[in-house]
């Protein structure tokens, strides 16, 4: 079989992922929801993950690491908490729908201003003119690092 939908999900998981999934099914516990061993074990695993991620990102404390169900939820949480009315964001029309919807909501409901940087006919960033988009109230440039649609990075 030729599998061409890795953008949605990876067909074959590494053995470590398979094992972690089996372990989770066998020892399921809900972190922070009780004092029985499965819950305590799950809480320890979550804390260990927070510590590892905190160290990797040089965060000041493991409590600074927040988990979300998926990238869209994480993105909406981050964008929703960063900006105030009158703030300015630079982005492109080639961003993922989850990014653009969040930014349009900020514009339409929160009074955030958006500017769109140029891309060429293949969706590649065009850096000419970016400097002119920066305003005194610019708080972020929200641009994808690589597109799973065009393959551009």
Ranges and model annotations:
Residues 1-153:
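Pyridoxal 5′-phosphate
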């Amino acid at each position: 079989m030729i599998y061409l939908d890795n953008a949605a999900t990876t067909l074959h998981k590494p053995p470590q992922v398979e094992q972690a999934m089996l372990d989770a099914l066998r020892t399921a516990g809900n972190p922070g929801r009780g004092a029985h061993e499965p819950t305590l074990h799950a809480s320890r695993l979550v804390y260990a993950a927070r510590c590892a991620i905190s160290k990797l990102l040089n965060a000041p404390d493991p409590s600074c690491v927040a988990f979300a169900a998926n990238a869209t939820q994480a993105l909406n949480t981050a964008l929703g908490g960063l900006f105030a009315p009158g703030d300015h964001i630079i982005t492109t029309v080639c961003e993922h729908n989850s990014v653009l919807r969040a930014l349009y909501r900020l514009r339409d409901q929160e009074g955030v201003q958006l500017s769109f940087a140029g891309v060429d006919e293949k969706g590649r960033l065009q850096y000419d003119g970016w400097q002119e988009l920066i305003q005194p109230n610019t708080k972020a440039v929200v641009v994808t690092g690589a597109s799973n649609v065009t393959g551009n990075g």
